Design a protein with these regions (language model features):
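Short S/T/G/P-rich N-terminal loop/turn motif that feeds into the first structured element of a domain
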Residues: 1-64, 72-84, 92-93, 98-184, ...
Length: 372
């Protein structure tokens, strides 16, 4: 039995990132698309961490295009793609596009390209090849109007589960919803293609009814019947997974899923996500640790850490992702304790227990698809 740990995903390994957009244009939209691409290219060129891009046209179908961009590492790209500036930059292109699919890859090997000296030095150490588990993880987060929390919880807990299978190769495996105050976090696990699964789920009548019931309670209004409004809402709500680590071997019985909410001080979200990812790497190698698997989600100054654990209260320090000396002090510097109602240093188990109680999100529903 394999009992080793594996990290199936990490935005913090230092490897270069290749982002690929597959674009299918509306008929007659080619010139508008090219103008929009020039606008986007000029804006992206000045973003720190962006190395370059290419625009390619299909030789079989001129309406199909491929945009690739390369980034020094994943964090600068994630900061850019989650920004309001990105939303405004890509808006002119959206009217031209019938369908668009985005994919992100770490550059693991490369031949036949002359790299600048600094990049050559970085490339002398090859990026790690990850052992995947066949699952893509993603989260959405949004806020509801204060005072509507209990109503929203009832709506989210009461809907009928949608059909899990999107097609022969894609299925929704697990959906878990949490709340912390007026913030909602929905995490999903997908076997196959994430975008295919999300589109499939969004079309299901059970889900559409829930989304409509939520609309009056949202702080940020949306019109799901308007493609541009719906697209903007879900882009702003996206909270990508930036790290996932798990122990190999059989899953212990009695695991419970928790989501821990870490609001960061302004500008510290990526540093906080990186700290938790590094700590989870260390913890996964300890067979006595309470956490069997963990996923770190990050957007702007919000970090959510999803953990499957037996009993976090018995070891609050490690359940919070704190291992070794001084890590509590580092976390305290990055964390917006006032937003959690917990201020001051994290110097002992009592402080950790208090923080764990304030950071632990309320579980609304946890649904697994039937195995098929």
């Amino acid at each position: 039995v394999n009992t080793s740990t594996y990290t199936s995903q990490s935005a913090f390994d230092g490897s270069r990132l290749r982002v690929i957009l597959l674009v299918d244009l509306h008929e007659g939209a080619q010139q508008r698309f090219l103008d929009a691409y020039e606008h986007m290219r000029n804006r992206v060129a000045s973003v720190p961490g962006h190395l370059g891009d290419q625009l390619c046209q299909s030789v079989e179908n001129p309406s199909q295009w491929l945009i690739t961009s390369e980034w020094a590492t994943a964090p600068p790209y994630l900061a850019w793609v989650n920004s309001e500036e990105h939303l405004e930059t890509v808006r002119p292109m959206q009217d031209c596009v019938r369908d668009i699919r985005s994919m992100r890859y770490s550059v693991v090997r490369e031949t036949g390209r002359a790299l600048p000296p600094t990049a050559q030095a970085a490339d002398s150490v090859q990026a790690p090849v990850r052992a995947g588990d066949g699952v893509t993880r993603h989260a959405l987060t949004f806020t509801v109007k204060p005072g509507s929390e209990s109503k929203v919880a009832d709506i989210l807990a009461g809907y009928a589960p949608p059909e899990a299978r999107a097609d022969d190769s894609t299925r929704l495996r697990r959906t878990t919803l949490f709340m912390h105050g007026n913030r909602v976090v929905r995490t999903v696990e997908v076997e196959g293609d994430l975008q295919t699964a999300l589109r499939h789920v969004s079309r299901q009548p059970e889900v559409r009814a829930v989304e409509e019931a939520l609309n009056p309670h949202l702080e940020q209004s949306r019109d799901l019947a308007d493609p541009a409004s719906a697209r903007a809402f879900f882009i702003r709500a996206a909270m990508p997974a930036v790290h996932h680590v798990a122990r190999g071997g059989p899953e212990p019985s009695g695991l419970r899923r928790h989501a821990l909410y870490y609001p960061a001080r302004e500008g510290c979200g990526m540093a906080l996500a990186r700290l938790l990812a590094q700590q989870d790497e260390t913890a996964a190698a300890d067979p006595a640790g309470p956490v069997h698997r963990s996923t770190v989600f990050h957007r702007d100054d919000l970090v959510v850490r999803l953990i499957d654990t037996l009993d976090p209260e018995t070891d609050p320090v490690r359940a919070l992702g704190l291992h070794g000396t001084r890590k509590g002090a580092v976390l305290a510097r990055l964390l917006d304790g006032a937003a959690l109602g917990v201020e001051g240093p994290l110097s002992d188990d009592r402080d950790a227990t208090r923080l764990l109680a304030h950071a632990d999100m309320t579980l609304i529903t946890d649904r697994r698809a039937a195995q098929s």
